[in-house]
């Protein structure tokens, strides 16, 4: 059934501006764009240890029931330093959605609203690190 995360999709009124903002944050440009990088309606980044995909889609293609206010499920991306990551996000225009919270030993979360209205969660998650270091099944 559910086999793994493939793509996290965010919406933006201005995909080109979101592309620039996320390129600055991630330190890498998108690897995929439609119809092109100059006037995109969709861009996709690969990031992290397992190259998960972050897609940014023009709001014109959002489902009719989609809200324009931040809300819904929060996807948390693992980071090694939540405080430093939140400070970086705030310095480039994000706003605090959920402040830094200690969730127990080895688990810290926080989330921000990006300049395009999406919630971006970050987390230090000891389980994530354990999974990365576990021997791979053959």
Cite the ranges covered by each PLM segment.
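Core segments of cupin and vicinal oxygen chelate
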Residues: 2-3, 9-52
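A short, acidic/glycine-rich surface segment
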Residues: 31, 41, 56-66, 98, ...
């Amino acid at each position: 059934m559910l086999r793994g995360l493939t793509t996290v999709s965010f919406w933006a009124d201005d995909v080109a501006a979101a592309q620039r903002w996320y390129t600055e944050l991630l330190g890498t440009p998108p690897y995929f764009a439609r119809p092109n990088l100059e006037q995109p309606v969709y861009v996709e980044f690969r990031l992290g240890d397992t190259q998960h995909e972050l897609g940014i889609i023009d709001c014109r293609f959002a489902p009719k029931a989609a809200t324009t206010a931040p809300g819904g499920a929060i996807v948390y991306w693992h980071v090694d330093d939540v405080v430093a990551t939140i400070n970086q996000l705030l310095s480039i225009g994000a706003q605090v959605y959920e402040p830094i919270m200690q969730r127990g030993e080895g688990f810290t979360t926080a989330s921000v609203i990006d300049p395009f209205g999406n919630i971006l969660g970050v987390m230090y998650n000891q389980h994530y690190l354990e999974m990365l270091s576990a021997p791979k099944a053959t």
